[in-house]
Curated annotation (Swiss-Prot):
<dbReference type="Pfam" id="PF09354">
    <property type="entry name" value="HNF_C"/>
</dbReference>
<dbReference type="Pfam" id="PF08430">
    <property type="entry name" value="Forkhead_N"/>
</dbReference>
<dbReference type="InterPro" id="IPR013638">
    <property type="entry name" value="Fork-head_N"/>
</dbReference>
<keyword id="KW-0539">Nucleus</keyword>
<dbReference type="GO" id="GO:0005634">
    <property type="term" value="C:nucleus"/>
</dbReference>
<feature type="compositionally biased region" description="Basic and acidic residues">
    <location>
        <begin position="219"/>
        <end position="234"/>
    </location>
</feature>
<feature type="DNA-binding region" description="Fork-head">
    <location>
        <begin position="119"/>
        <end position="213"/>
    </location>
</feature>
<dbReference type="Pfam" id="PF00250">
    <property type="entry name" value="Forkhead"/>
</dbReference>
<dbReference type="InterPro" id="IPR018533">
    <property type="entry name" value="Forkhead_box_C"/>
</dbReference>
<protein>
    <recommendedName>
        <fullName>Forkhead box protein A4</fullName>
    </recommendedName>
</protein>
<dbReference type="InterPro" id="IPR050211">
    <property type="entry name" value="FOX_domain-containing"/>
</dbReference>
<dbReference type="InterPro" id="IPR030456">
    <property type="entry name" value="TF_fork_head_CS_2"/>
</dbReference>
<keyword id="KW-0238">DNA-binding</keyword>
<dbReference type="GO" id="GO:0030154">
    <property type="term" value="P:cell differentiation"/>
</dbReference>
<keyword id="KW-0678">Repressor</keyword>
<dbReference type="GO" id="GO:0019904">
    <property type="term" value="F:protein domain specific binding"/>
</dbReference>
<keyword id="KW-0805">Transcription regulation</keyword>
Amino acid sequence: MLNRVKLEIKDPMDWNTMYQESEIYSGIHNMNNGLPSNSFLPTDVSTVPTSMPYMSNGLSGPVTSIQGNLGSLGSMTQGMVGSLAPPASTPAYPMGYCQGESEFQRDPRTYRRNYSHAKPPYSYISLITMAIQQAPNKMMTLNEIYQWIIDLFPYYRQNQQRWQNSIRHSLSFNDCFVKVPRSPEKPGKGSYWTLHPESGNMFENGCYLRRQKRFKCERSKSGEREKKVNKPGDENGGSLKETPVGYDDCSSSRSPQAPVNDGGRDSTGSSIHQASGGSPVGLSPTSEQAGTASQLMYPLGLSNDGYLGLVGEDVHLKHDPFSGRHPFSITQLMSSEQDQTYPSKLEMCPTTDHLVHYSNYSSDYHNMASKNGLDMQTSSSTDNGYYANMYSRPILSSL
């Protein structure tokens, strides 16, 4: 027996040869590490000190029994831990609880907006009026109105561009809002907006849900009346603009006489100007000279009344009053020529009498004949008399 004890003391691992593998329990050091570190089981229980001098053979039985009980306890704890562990195929949280927010997705159809995020039942004019009336100075800039609406109604924190455009249109196209420019004392960007002094009764008893009536400024009404009044004036102005056209119509009725007058001037040269008042009005020729001139210049049988009418039109032409006083002026040269040409024209009258009987012929032939007669008349005058009278001042021009 002592030899056996000594053998145990020398080599404690020889116990394995005495028991089968099925009868040997694993020590507590082989237990699962999943147990907490502060477990009630000691880690060095398997190493039982056997080198005590008082140990006898009777103590070996209790030691082995204790070690066997501890081994069975370790196997029980390992089995319990294995049964509590979830299977590898199933997820740890099958219901989806306690997961991260990134993995959780809420169905948008089941989501209902809170009452605070719902659209307010106020119009844009009501919102602007509320913002301005709650301001300390009863005026706000456009950005201040935007900020006031966003702070009070969370619904307008989304789609800001849409409703901000509507706010601007409401401010511009309603007479109840007045734009006030900034004063030099308060520099900044943007003008102020305030309520019209006469627009206090737009809402019933301060209820902004519905307007009582649409406010219109009296000034705008008067402007519309002025526009309506100015419309008939524009029509009258159009009729006044059409009056020159009527004047052209009247002048066109006289157009048949215009070629006759122009033809008379072209065919006679400067003699019409002499007879019709090329000189001042006081130097007009006598009626007899006018009659003889009419026979010479108009052999087609024009009446004296028609000719005098044409002459009367030329009398009213504007002439230079100082043109007759200069010795080399055209009027004096033509007046000096007039004194010499008229006697020769009287002498030429018998030669042109035969042209009167052929009044049915074309006017071109008679105008050509009368023009040739005048050319012969001017060529027959001597140059000595012409130059002698050119430098002398006529008696009539001095009047």
